[in-house]
């Protein structure tokens, strides 16, 4: 009985990762499952985040459901990291292992077929099996979009209309440089797990104008929960005179942690790019 059970599981696993191909000359060759790297853009407004949830209302759930329809068995995807409910992405990256004997372009078309309009795979490529969407990433770039005027109905999902019309952008531009470098960012996180490493490095931090709105751009090797939104909220507090640059510098030294910071809403946050 145990021998049969072992053979059953052995051939089940084997069939999942190895398939039979016939080449142009009619000769057979063995084909191992390949690792596929995918880039995806999504509007996170209606999703409860990236990571799979019990109610299946996460971006990961939608993509895995599409993969099940293609391969007729469950395929787990591994993302570069999580995004929270309401957060968007232009360049989220994930990978999965599956047998696919056609061109990557055909897989791209198959993935996008019947996906909801809010999710679109923008690139598919075969990669070495040592690649990992999360652990191979060197840095991630986030953009936070905000403006000083009310948003019209066609942009309200993707930008924060800051409720302070007299916000001094020059103060934000002066304060944002405080965040560059290696710091303990626990004072700029929503919540921190007991054993979590709160020391992170931001290689660039800046604010620039794009048409009629402004963009906070952060590039770094790692982020804490709600870290970008907390930084954005702190900058707005500087811009309206509630705190000053010295306050941010002291908080990065883990002083005045008892003082609550504003958390910017999720709608303006985009995962722009994952760098490998």
State each model region's role.
Residues 1-2, 30:
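Intrinsically disordered, low-complexity cationic segments
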Residues 9-10, 18:
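Short linear motifs in intrinsically disordered
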């Amino acid at each position: 009985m145990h021998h049969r059970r072992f053979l059953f599981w052995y051939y089940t696993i084997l069939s999942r990762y190895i398939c039979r191909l016939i080449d142009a000359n009619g000769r057979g060759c063995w084909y191992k499952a390949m690792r596929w790297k995918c880039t995806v853009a999504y509007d996170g407004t209606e999703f409860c985040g990236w990571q799979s949830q019990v109610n299946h209302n996460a971006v990961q759930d939608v993509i895995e459901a599409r993969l099940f329809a293609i391969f007729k068995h469950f395929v787990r995807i591994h993302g570069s990291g999580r995004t929270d409910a309401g957060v968007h992405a232009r360049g989220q990256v994930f990978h999965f292992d599956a047998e696919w004997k056609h061109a990557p372009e055909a897989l791209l078309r198959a993935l996008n077929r019947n996906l909801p309009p809010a999710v679109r795979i923008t690139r598919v490529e075969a990669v070495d099996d040592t690649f990992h969407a999360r652990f191979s990433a060197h840095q991630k770039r986030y953009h936070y979009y905000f403006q000083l005027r009310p948003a019209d109905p066609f942009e309200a999902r993707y930008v924060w209309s800051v409720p302070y019309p007299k916000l001094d952008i020059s103060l934000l531009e002066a304060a944002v440089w405080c965040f560059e470098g290696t710091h303990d960012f626990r004072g700029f996180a929503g919540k921190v797990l007991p054993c979590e490493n709160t020391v992170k490095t931001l290689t660039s931090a800046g604010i620039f104008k794009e048409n009629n709105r402004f963009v906070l751009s952060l590039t770094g090797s790692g982020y804490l929960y709600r870290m970008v939104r907390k930084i954005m909220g702190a900058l707005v507090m500087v811009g309206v005179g509630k705190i000053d640059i010295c306050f941010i510098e002291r908080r990065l030294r883990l002083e005045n942690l008892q003082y609550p910071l504003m958390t910017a809403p999720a709608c303006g946050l985009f995962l722009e790019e994952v760098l490998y």
